[in-house]
């Protein structure tokens, strides 16, 4: 197996979380998915592993933060142009994300929005 990075995240609602990451461009990898987890690949080597809270707790004794209240991590996804950034954000909103909790930034060489 080639080297990969899988960012493990707790998911309160596995189906809704899976739909959200699919909307962002992830592809479900059935090899690493099941009733308590979903693996979504963004490239051949980079993915997100969503785990139900019960399954996530098998790996840590630390409390699971509330993703709606607490910052848990920040992820940056690249896109080919400004329109692709806006389209990705629109898909994420349809899948349950909240658009622009922070103002959009246009730095000339880079345009970003937040979900």
Predicted feature locations:
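Short amphipathic alpha-helical segments
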Residues: 3-7, 69-75
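Core segments of cupin and vicinal oxygen chelate
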Residues: 8-57
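Short beta-strand-to-loop capping motifs
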Residues: 11, 77-80
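Residues at or immediately preceding the N-termini of alpha-helices
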Residues: 14, 82-83
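Short amphipathic alpha-helices within nucleic acid-binding modules
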Residues: 20, 83-89
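Short hydrophobic/aromatic beta-strand or adjacent loop that forms the aromatic wall/cage
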Residues: 35-37, 72, 110-112
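Vicinal oxygen chelate
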Residues: 40, 48, 89-115
